[in-house]
UniProtKB/Swiss-Prot annotation:
The keyword Signal applies. This is Myeloid-derived growth factor homolog. It is found in: Secreted. It comes from Dictyostelium discoideum. It comes from the Eukaryota. The keyword Secreted applies. Keywords: Secreted, Signal. Belongs to the MYDGF family. Residues 1-22 form the signal peptide. One of its GO terms (cellular component) is extracellular space. InterPro entries: MYDGF (IPR018887).
Length: 150
C-alpha cells in the first residue's frame, strides 16, 4: 500500500513537471488588402514572434499566429487556417527572438498555396535571422513556421 502511495505521488509530480514544460498561446488577426504595412506579435516566456506584412488583392482574411515552447525550444506558426489565401503580399518579414538572449536562430519553413517554398527561392534569411521575401517572391503565402534552435 505504501509503495502505491509513493508511485501515485511520483506520477503526479511527473505529470505536473511535464505539463509545465510545454506552453502555448495564439491570436487571431485580420489581414486587410490595403497595402499598408502592419505587424502582429506574440510573446511567450522568453520568446517573441513578429510578423510584418503588406497585402493587396482579395478580401479581408482571418489569419492566426501561434507560439509554443517546449523544453527550451520555441515554434511560431503564422497562417490562414482554412481555406487557402487569396491575398497578394507585397512584402513580409517574420522573426522569432529569444528575448532573454536577444538572439534569433531559426529554422524557417514557408509555404505558398502550392506547397513548401525552398529557402533562397522566394524568401531569404537575413544576417540577423529575419525571414523576408526575395526578389523572386511571387506574392503568395499560406503559412510560415519558425522553429528556434536550442
Amino acid at each position: 500500500m505504501t509503495f502505491l502511495k509513493y508511485l501515485l505521488i511520483l506520477c503526479t509530480i511527473f505529470l505536473m513537471v511535464t505539463n509545465s514544460l510545454s506552453e502555448e498561446i495564439d491570436k487571431e488577426f485580420n489581414i486587410k488588402p490595403e497595402g499598408n504595412l502592419d505587424t502582429v506579435e506574440l510573446v511567450l516566456e522568453n520568446y517573441k514572434c513578429i510578423f510584418s506584412f503588406a497585402a493587396t488583392g482579395g478580401t479581408n482574411e482571418n489569419w492566426k499566429i501561434f507560439l509554443t515552447t517546449e523544453n527550451g525550444v520555441a515554434t511560431c506558426f503564422i497562417g490562414r487556417p482554412k481555406p487557402i489565401s487569396y491575398l497578394f503580399f507585397k512584402q513580409f518579414s517574420a522573426q522569432l527572438i529569444n528575448t532573454k538572449t536577444g538572439k534569433s536562430n531559426i529554422i524557417p519553413e514557408i509555404s505558398d498555396n502550392s506547397g513548401i517554398m525552398p529557402l533562397g527561392d522566394q524568401y531569404i534569411l537575413t544576417s540577423d535571422n529575419k525571414v523576408v521575401q526575395s526578389n523572386n517572391f511571387a506574392g503568395n503565402l499560406a503559412f510560415l513556421v519558425l522553429n528556434s534552435d536550442k
